[in-house]
Amino acid sequence: MEQKTLQVEGMSCQHCVKAVETSVGELDGVSAVHVNLEAGKVDVSFDADKVSVKDIADAIEDQGYDVAK
């Protein structure tokens, strides 16, 4: 199991938190998602054999937020 923290821009409310947690949490291989709205960070625990950091970032960007590269 790996853990990664992504810097995410554009989140401003609890709806944003729920959207990111749901979209990332539905990915196969993701075991935990925690969004820190104030810091603009998303902590993800995942199985790198099943899902990549790019897949996780894409899921966040699909919700309309920007992931720092």
From Swiss-Prot:
Q: Could you tell me which SUPFAM superfamilies the record lists for this protein? A: HMA, heavy metal-associated domain
- Xref: InterPro entries: CopZ, Cu-bd, Heavy-metal-associated_CS, HMA_Cu_ion-bd, HMA_dom, HMA_dom_sf
PROSITE patterns xref list: HMA_1, HMA_2
Bridged cysteine pairs (disulfide): none
Gene Ontology cellular component annotations, sorted alphabetically: cytoplasm
Gene Ontology MF terms: copper ion binding
Listed A to Z, the keywords are:
Chaperone, Copper, Cytoplasm, Metal-binding
Which Pfam family is one of those matched by this entry? HMA
Record Gene3D superfamilies:
3.30.70.100
Which GO terms fall under biological process for this protein?
Answer: copper ion transport
Induction / repression: By Cu(2+).
Coarse class of the primary localization is cytoplasm
Q: Which residues bind Cu cation?
A: 13, 16
Residue ranges of domain HMA in the record:
2-68
- Its biological function? Chaperone that serves for the intracellular sequestration and transport of Cu(+). Delivers Cu(+) to the copper-transporting ATPase CopA. Functions in E.coli to transfer Cu(+) to CopA missing its first metal-binding domain.
Q: Which PANTHER family match?
A: P-TYPE CATION-TRANSPORTING ATPASE
What protein name is recorded for this chain? Copper chaperone CopZ
